């Protein structure tokens, strides 16, 4: 059971949420008094409480979602709060639904979406994974961070062929290496205020690091927001090549490192928005004509469940008509379907841009 001090903090946080009438987070929408009372004393076997789940959303009332999972068990123990939020965010993934088994599908179905190189600047596909037997960020000890990094770096050092590369720990990193990784846009920074409030940045930079292959087309982030972020990317529009590289890497790593998986929710991640396939396939794409007709752009995006962001990701502007466009759906469909939907949508956008 949660201790009295934790419950007192929770009561205070709940009052703050209640009073915040202009707060639009999913946390506020779904944390009713009944649900709050039924969950406030619960504690996972690793010691996580409802406070770990909601504290970021309580501190940052402008959160979109407002909750994180401190460990894998939290998704089950605090399901009365997680499930409706997951259903709301992953539109159509009902509380009775079950995420399908992993299926990367026929990788030959993916192509170069822009063979002339007119529209697509770069292509990237990533997924997140959590290592079985370890909690997520807020509950990790410094020793666990280091132990995980050791496992990850030794696993990655076994990669061969195109995936062969080097691991760079953030701890003790020289200024030169740091600058080089920043210039390549590889280095991740300490978390933003949402992650800070969720206690996702403790013992920084212990256990954090970056692996990349010699061609700089394959990247693994260790202990950033998730235990592992596996990323395949390159200039141009060859989605097929990018996807195939990611799939072979994930399959290879999976043989050596068991990942946390949930029967109903698929692969588990720290933030419920990334559950399921955890896959985000994206392009940086120049669409000057559609940029001038934002309504049409949004209409096509909605039809193919695409998310349109500014050039530098969430909450940024499209610089020079360049957008970051990705698949929106991660749950209730396979990896293949998620990326195929994105490919179809991008092909359609290019077709319309050409016709305008």
UniProtKB/Swiss-Prot annotation:
Residue ranges constituting the Phosphagen kinase N-terminal domain according to the UniProt record: 9-91
GO biological process: phosphocreatine biosynthetic process
Cellular compartments per GO CC: extracellular space
Catalytic activity: L-arginine + ATP = N(omega)-phospho-L-arginine + ADP + H(+)
Cystine pairings recorded for this chain: none
N-acetylalanine carried by residues: 2
Database matches in InterPro entries: ATP-guanido_PTrfase, ATP-guanido_PTrfase_AS, ATP-guanido_PTrfase_cat, ATP-guanido_PTrfase_N, ATP-guanido_PTrfase_N_sf, Gln_synth/guanido_kin_cat_dom
PROSITE patterns: PHOSPHAGEN_KINASE, PHOSPHAGEN_KINASE_C, PHOSPHAGEN_KINASE_N
Family as reported in the entry's similarity comment: Belongs to the ATP:guanido phosphotransferase family.
Protein name: Arginine kinase
Record organism: Homarus gammarus (European lobster)
Taxonomic classification: Eukaryota, Metazoa, Ecdysozoa, Arthropoda, Crustacea
């Amino acid at each position: 059971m949660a201790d009295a001090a934790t419950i007192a903090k929770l009561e205070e946080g709940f009052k703050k949420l209640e009073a915040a009438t202009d707060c639009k987070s999913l946390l506020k929408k779904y944390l009713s008094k009944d649900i709050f009372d039924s969950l406030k004393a619960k504690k996972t076997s690793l010691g996580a409480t409802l406070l770990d789940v909601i504290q970021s959303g309580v501190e940052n009332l402008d959160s979109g979602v407002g909750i994180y999972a401190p460990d894998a068990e939290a998704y089950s123990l605090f399901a009365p709060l997680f499930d409706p939020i997951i259903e709301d965010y992953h539109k159509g993934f009902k509380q009775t639904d079950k995420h399908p088994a992993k299926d990367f599908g026929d990788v030959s179905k993916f192509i170069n979406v822009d063979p002339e190189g007119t529209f697509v600047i770069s292509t990237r596909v990533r997924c997140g994974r959590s290592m079985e037997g370890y909690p997520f960020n807020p509950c990790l000890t410094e020793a666990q961070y280091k132990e995980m990094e050791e496992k990850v770096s030794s696993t990655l050092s076994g990669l061969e062929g195109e995936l062969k590369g080097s691991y760079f720990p953030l701890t003790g990193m020289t200024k030169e290496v740091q600058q080089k990784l920043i210039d390549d846009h590889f280095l991740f920074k300490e978390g933003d205020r949402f992650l800070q409030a969720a206690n996702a940045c403790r013992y920084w930079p212990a256990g954090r690091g970056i692996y990349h292959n010699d061609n700089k087309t394959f990247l693994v982030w260790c202990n950033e927001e998730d235990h592992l972020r596996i990323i395949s990317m390159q200039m141009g529009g060859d989605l097929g090549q990018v996807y195939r590289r990611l799939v072979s890497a994930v399959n290879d790593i999976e043989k050596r490192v068991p990942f946390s998986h949930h029967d109903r929710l698929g692969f588990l991640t720290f933030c419920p928005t990334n559950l399921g396939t955890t896959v985000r396939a994206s392009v940086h794409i120049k669409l000057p004509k559609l940029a001038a007709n934002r309504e049409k752009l949004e209409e096509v995006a909605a039809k193919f469940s695409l998310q349109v962001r500014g050039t530098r990701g969430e909450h940024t502007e499209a610089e020079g008509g360049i957008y970051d466009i990705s698949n929106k759906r991660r749950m209730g469909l396979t990896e293949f379907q998620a990326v195929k939907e994105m490919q179809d949508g991008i092909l359609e956008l290019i077709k319309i841009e050409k016709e305008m």
